[in-house]
């Protein structure tokens, strides 16, 4: 947890915080998607996390992918911006976060794939056909299947506001 988040949590306790965040979609040469298994919740997600104060989203996704997988990446497309009830997470300590997530497709430019052993326990590539059998985070179940269809265009889910 960043110093910024610690300070916020000291002020608001476990109440809901809306958090700008990023996720990186990294594909291998067989169009398999890189996922990491998080230690918190033991679920699979694409690498990503919170945007730090004064950090640009494109820098945050590069940093987060590096921290979680040891891969150097370059963002090449913004695939969408997502939020809603599926993006609300209650952590084991009771903290609640509602993520608003900018999702970038990224190109691998260096590094050797490995999980960090703390935040991420495992990192590997999965084919689209393997996703239904995985223990995915709720938000990942919503957005990853359509985003596996690679495109230079953003994907916008159906509008639900009435």
Feature names for model-found ranges:
Residues 1-23, 94:
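Acidic, metal-coordinating catalytic segment for phosphate/diphosphate chemistry
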Residues 8, 46, 113:
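Short clusters of hydrophobic/aromatic residues that line enzyme substrate/ligand-binding pockets
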Residues 28-68:
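Conserved Nudix-box catalytic region and its N-terminal flanking loop in Nudix hydrolases
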Residues 51-77, 82-139, 162:
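Unchanged
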Residues 19, 39-41, 46, 73, ...:
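Short connector loops at helix/strand junctions that flank enzyme active sites
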Residues 142-162:
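Charged phosphate-binding loop/patch that engages nucleotide di/tri-phosphates or the phosphate backbone
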Residues 23, 32, 122:
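Conserved beta-strand and immediately adjacent loop positions that scaffold enzyme active sites
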Residues 37, 48, 117, 135, ...:
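Short, flexible helix/strand-to-coil boundary loops that buttress conserved ligand/catalytic motifs
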């Amino acid at each position: 947890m960043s110093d910024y988040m610690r300070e916020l949590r000291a002020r608001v306790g476990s109440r809901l915080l809306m958090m700008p965040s990023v996720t990186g979609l990294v594909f291998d040469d067989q169009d398999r998607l890189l996922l990491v298994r998080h230690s918190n919740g033991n679920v699979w997600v694409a690498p990503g996390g919170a945007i730090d104060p004064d950090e640009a989203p494109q820098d945050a996704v590069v940093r987060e992918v590096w921290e979680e997988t040891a891969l150097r990446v370059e963002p090449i497309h913004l695939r969408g911006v997502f939020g809603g009830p599926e993006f609300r997470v209650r952590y084991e300590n009771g903290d609640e976060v509602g993520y608003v997530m900018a999702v970038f497709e990224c190109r691998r430019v260096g590094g050797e794939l490995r999980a960090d052993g703390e935040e991420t326990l495992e990192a590997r590539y999965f084919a689209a056909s393997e996703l239904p059998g995985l223990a995915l985070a709720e938000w990942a179940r919503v957005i990853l299947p359509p985003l596996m269809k690679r495109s230079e265009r953003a994907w916008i889910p159906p509008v639900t506001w009435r």
